[in-house]
């Protein structure tokens, strides 16, 4: 699984004003994780 390291400050700003920009990225990450987990079984 690929780990993405993001600065805490960036996370904080994203969680605030830019959350609407980050949500699609988070959803994409979640989907990728689910697909990776599913292919493991």
Swiss-Prot record:
What keywords would UniProt list here?
A: Antibiotic, Antimicrobial, Bacteriocin, Cell wall, Methylation, Secreted, Thioether bond
Propeptide residue interval(s): 1-27
Q: Crosslinked positions for Thiazole-4-carboxylic acid (Thr-Cys)?
A: 30-31
According to the UniProt entry, the cross-link of type 5-methyloxazole-4-carboxylic acid (Cys-Thr) is at 29-30, 31-32
Placement of covalent cross-link Oxazole-4-carboxylic acid (Ile-Ser): 35-36
Q: Does the keyword Secreted apply?
A: yes
Query: Crosslinked positions for 5-methyloxazole-4-carboxylic acid (Thr-Thr)?
Result: 32-33
Lineage, top-rank taxon, reads: Bacteria
Q: Which residues carry this modification: N2,N2-dimethylarginine?
A: 28
Q: Which GO terms describe its cellular component?
A: extracellular region; Gram-positive-bacterium-type cell wall
Cross-link Thiazole-4-carboxylic acid (Arg-Cys): give the residues. Answer: 28-29
Q: Crosslink Oxazole-4-carboxylic acid (Ser-Ser) sits at which residues?
A: 36-37, 37-38, 38-39
Which coarse location class applies to the principal site listed for this UniProt protein? secreted
Modification(s) after translation: Maturation of thiazole and oxazole containing antibiotics involves the enzymatic condensation of a Cys, Ser or Thr with the alpha-carbonyl of the preceding amino acid to form a thioether or ether bond, then dehydration to form a double bond with the alpha-amino nitrogen. Thiazoline or oxazoline ring are dehydrogenated to form thiazole or oxazole rings. 2 forms exist: plantazolicin A and plantazolicin B. The structural difference between them is a dimethylation at Arg-28 in plantazolicin A.
Its biological purpose is as follows: Peptide antibiotic inhibiting growth of Gram-positive bacteria in the dimethylated form plantazolicin A. The desmethyl form plantazolicin B has no antibiotic activity. The mode of action appears to be disruption of cell walls and lysis of cells. Inhibits B.subtilis strain HB0042, B.megaterium strain 7A1 and B.anthracis (MIC=2-4 ug/ml). Weakly inhibits Gram-positive bacteria B.brevis strain ATCC 8246, B.subtilis strain 168, B.cereus strain ATCC 14579 and strain CU1065, B.licheniformis strain ATCC 9789, M.luteus, B.sphaericus, P.granivorans and S.pyogenes (MIC=128 ug/ml).
Protein name as catalogued: Plantazolicin
Q: Which organism is it from?
A: Bacillus velezensis (strain DSM 23117 / BGSC 10A6 / LMG 26770 / FZB42)
């Amino acid at each position: 699984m690929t780990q993405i390291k993001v600065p805490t400050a960036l996370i904080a700003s994203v969680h605030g004003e830019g959350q609407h920009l980050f949500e699609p990225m988070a959803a994409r990450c979640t989907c990728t994780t689910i697909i990776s987990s599913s292919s493991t079984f």
